């Protein structure tokens, strides 16, 4: 029996071929949507609605369907028919039904706690259906009354009908929402196996889960596995006739077994099955219209402005972002455009603090913005003396959110599921929880206590933000006894001592940001601008580093004393328009000229009150502005706006803005220290090679006790920073104008954190003592050693090797600097220990050929004690650390060539270049003795390892063992490298044979014969191409005849005969450059040109064959061998046959020997195991 549409006057039926392709849909189970279907279809209320009562697809709009992969259409949930034979429903009536349906669904989820179980509660369904049926009866009566009246008031009645229908729908939507409340209050407690009872233990809380209500393909839900675990899943296919769903379990790396017994991750389940549930969301999704402005999410939690282009349905929109990119975004990831602030607030802000205009460079001493802190500021500007008083309020390192003033409900954060991966809510890059603290040293460290249901009772999870790394959050677990843990290793040892098992899923030290972003639990408020991570500062390598540091410290030092809370933890200011220190070289700007300016600037900074110079982080956000270099850039909707007034272009990243300024606004480029290039950005995106990578240090390398001690030391170091700045400022003010004091003992490549406070204070005192002395003249060798980079042995990158060309001996100081003797041995020893100076290698190789050997002059060859005396310095000598690591001067190396004496003969030492590689079979990467180079891989190897001891034994062409026996090489390419007999005509000759004077002539004849053979092969290929062209010329309709639309030979002759002539460039007329149409191609002319071309090529091939024949005749005349045509060569044939037989025998023996060796190797490996 076929299916038929139940709508009156609809001819759709599945029994006729003309209705093929029409789909039929049964009435939905939801009573509210079913009532709308009955009302719109005008079905009699007395008719019983069963599964056989169907509505065809002709009564739905195209917008009501979803397109699935196989091209079929699937009806969306919660839609109703609107197209009928008596006409299409009015748009206002359709919108009224949608609003009533949405209002009823929202009220049902928020006000009725038992609405999730409405499908199983017959009383609730019956009451709801009775109310809707009553509304439909009253509406049908009004419709009949309007149809009977055929007077002139018919037009007014038609207008009033939609209004009455809308009021009826609203009433029908409001009444059922109140009816289930009363019914559910009288209902009994649901079964313990239901989803709502398992996740909502309190009777007053609304249910978190319900039966699947979103049946679209790809919708998320949770399914109960065979083991009894609720696992996340997605809908793959929907079968409306059988009311079943094909569910695919999402793969989880924590699953040890398959979620189903059959071993597959897909399973058919009934829609009403108790093994399926979906989370109820109380969040009302915003509704957008066409061409409406909105804030849509990009790849992360940040949202950017865009415009709605299309309404795709299923709460999905096509958004055109302001930068021109188009993307489909769901409504959960979109917000309405925020309202602009009233002009009164802007006026008040301008009165309180007038910001600098956009695009203007920052002045040399702007006011530093301070972080807002929730703690109370204690003390006044003169209360610096009460720094260590116990009555002072506890400071807070970071501006944590005020939990009391934060409205969590308005943010629309979802509830964290208690199954699967753990996470917590994040607002403005901060976890949401209970405010807490940890006592570290003498103060309290503010933390956030987050709830983790996996931890055993009594355990507490603290999350805190580091004070030295912006935005970095760490986790500390506190046991019931009060013991703190920050690493897995310490916690594992503790649990093992307590006879407990360590479970990494329970004791988790990860913060799980990605999980929070996936479930939309990571949000930003409207007035918050996320601060990008700070970039590393460029290292100062100039000679005036100490002077620059003292100047910057003096600028950053306030003239009036500040409270402890502000002075210790204030934001680093932004750099001014002064060029960076690495660009100020002594050649372009002498120290004598810059000193008065510097002193004047220091005086201005000291007289300026609290004005401070901004130096460090270029991303200080203040009232919607960011300082990039020396420019103040506006931030609008998380985008950087170009500082040019008439430009107003926006960019997502700072680098793109700098590139735009460098290319289009060169007047602003001078205010930025560094404008990146596209090549530099491409290099940053590439993955570093294994040579550039340094071995990674484990994250949890610091023990638990040392970590908290280190945190305390950092806080103490920050509190003492102003003392060191004042000392350095005093030292700078007392320095004469003609002295540029440098950190002579510091390497410019070393990072400041590696210096301990005691050593740094010692270095500061040494600088002061050096400044007190008379004018000093720098030694050129000393300045050169100061600029040379060093690498610690433990920090040497992979791929580098330490050879003698990188070694040098420690030499005494040759400088006549009187101030240099002020250093004591204790200071030198402390500096050596603080910088982990590598010990110079004292081994000197005695035999080298092509390598970097020890620099021993010829006059001291016979003195073996010379190397020891040079390589081992006396402990009483005054040595310089940098001079000991620097290489010997270039003058001493280039005075005379270096030699060694071997068996009474002098051998000259050739130094290897830095880029040359040593790759020997002994796997020793140092030069030792005679070195030979492979012709193929160009790697150097030890001659002794390859059986070559003397230089006379080195072959003319040497191929190493690795190139001769490559791994997994083809047999046909095994002797690819040995082709001298083909190209040079040289045949292998045994060493025990006597020299043949005719060998050179024979090799020449063989080479010429091989050349002729190659020419014959080239002529054969040319003849093949001529045959192909002849085949093309025979066929007039051949598709490749167009290639000869022009003559080939004439073009070649003209191009070779013409010589380039330099002519004056003519000015092009102001005529439009319009492309001219090409002339039509005549196949007959192409055929004629091809035949002419074949004739020319044929003549060239014949001439080439004639030349080859002439050369062959000449070679035959030069051949001095006897003609063997008539000679008796039977003896020679027998000898060759015997020789070939013996070769076959040797080949078999070699094969047997190889098999025996393989068996022996396998046997040895088995015994060793």
Swiss-Prot record:
Bias (Polar residues) occurs at: 107-122, 353-363, 542-559, 774-784, 853-862, 869-881
Q: Where is the composition biased (Basic residues)?
A: 798-810
- Outline the residue ranges of the record's C2H2-type zinc fingers: 640-665
What organism does the UniProt record list as the source? Drosophila melanogaster
| Protein name, entry field | Protein MBD-R2
- Region annotation (Disordered) ranges: 99-122, 140-211, 347-394, 527-565, 714-890
* Quaternary structure, from the entry: Component of the non-specific lethal (NLS) histone acetyltransferase complex at least composed of mof, nls1, dgt1/NSL2, Rcd1/NSL3, Rcd5/MCRS2, MBD-R2 and wds.
**For bias kind Low complexity, which ranges apply?**
190-202, 726-742
